[in-house]
């Protein structure tokens, strides 16, 4: 059996590769990406731009193979609008066309919680999506493209769509990493509030759940929010990081009425800090995502939130989170 991972050079793809090789040492993994990464010989790298049709002339592809579609433009804000649509929508079209061409019957698609839109209310899988960013819109359209592919042969095709919260772990270089180093350098301050809900999932848990669904989902379309249940507040996340890593940092709170004008001024000055009103609003807003469906799916979590942070810390020789 072959596993094709689009965007396999990235954070989630790297962890999935490690898990696949751990469970299936003799499997063949193909990393389809524009960034070369053979992951120490664990995968076969093939240059692939998902914005263009996918042709694999030298690989024997069978209907029993599996596609993990991770390729995406996702940092928001950070890209021009057309980049989200170009990569995420054309990518979905070309990946599903590749599956169609070779008769591949199973796809796992990593979407996002962005299709829910920005709002404080709890979002379940049955919540009507109301995306309010180009990224969120492009991801919702990409979900529909994958769903159409499945519907063309619904009795045989298996599609799992996951909407992860903030994914953290070794190599993420994202929100949790910045939070840790901000705490460590005494530069982190709560933006506007301490009760902001930040739904999240450990990367090792996410890839384990993906394989679990492959084994327990025969056909049809399924959609899962992927987050710890219940989701944690930023204050709880900070407290856990402090406890596990021994930082014991106290973070002050900056009121929103101070923070927003300051962000506007800093943004106008073009400071290389990534600070602007849009990013500050994102920091202050909750990602209040319900993980109950995942919790009730029969899947057993390998880590509590605290254990996940501790495992990540251990992966960095108990020195830091990175």
What kind of region is each of these model predictions?
Residues 50-90, 98-101, 116:
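NAD(P)H-binding glycine-rich loop region in Rossmannoid oxidoreductase-like domains
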Residues 94-134:
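Conserved Rossmann-fold NAD(P)-dependent oxidoreductase catalytic core, especially the SDR/UDP-sugar
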Residues 172-178, 192-214, 221-225:
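Substrate-positioning beta->alpha
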Residues 212-275, 310-322:
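Mid/C-terminal beta-alpha module of Rossmann-like enzyme folds, strongest
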């Amino acid at each position: 059996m072959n596993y094709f991972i689009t965007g396999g050079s990235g954070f989630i793809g790297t962890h999935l590769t490690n898990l696949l090789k751990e469970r299936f040492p003799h499997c063949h993994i193909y990393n389809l990406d524009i960034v070369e990464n053979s992951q120490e010989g664990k995968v076969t790298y093939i240059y692939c731009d998902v914005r263009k049709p996918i042709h694999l002339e030298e690989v024997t592809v069978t209907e029993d193979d599996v596609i993990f579609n991770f390729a995406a433009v996702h940092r928001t804000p950070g890209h021009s609008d057309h980049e989200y649509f170009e990569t995420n929508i054309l990518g979905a079209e070309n990946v599903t066309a590749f599956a169609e061409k070779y008769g591949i019957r199973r796809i796992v698609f990593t979407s996002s919680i962005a299709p829910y839109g920005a709002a404080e209310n709890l979002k379940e899988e049955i919540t009507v999506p109301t995306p309010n960013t180009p990224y969120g819109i492009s991801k919702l359209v990409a979900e529909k493209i994958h769903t159409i592919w499945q519907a063309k042969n619904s009795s045989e095709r298996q599609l799992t769509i996951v909407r992860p919260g903030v994914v953290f772990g070794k190599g993420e270089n994202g929100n949790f990493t910045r939070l840790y180093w901000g705490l460590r350098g005494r530069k982190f301050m709560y933006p506007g509030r301490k009760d902001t809900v930040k739904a999240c999932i450990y990367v090792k848990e996410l890839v384990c759940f993906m394989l679990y669904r492959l084994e327990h989902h025969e056909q049809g379309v399924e959609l899962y929010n992927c987050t710890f249940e219940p989701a944690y507040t930023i204050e709880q996340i900070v407290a856990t990081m402090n406890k596990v890593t021994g930082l014991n940092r106290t973070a002050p709170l900056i009121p929103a009425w101070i923070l927003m004008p300051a962000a506007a001024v800093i943004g106008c000055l073009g400071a290389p800090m990534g600070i602007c009103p849009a990013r500050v609003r994102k920091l202050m807003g909750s990602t209040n995502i319900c993980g109950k469906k995942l919790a009730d799916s029969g899947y057993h979590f390998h880590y509590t939130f605290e254990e996940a942070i501790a495992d990540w810390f251990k992966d960095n020789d108990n020195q830091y989170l990175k």
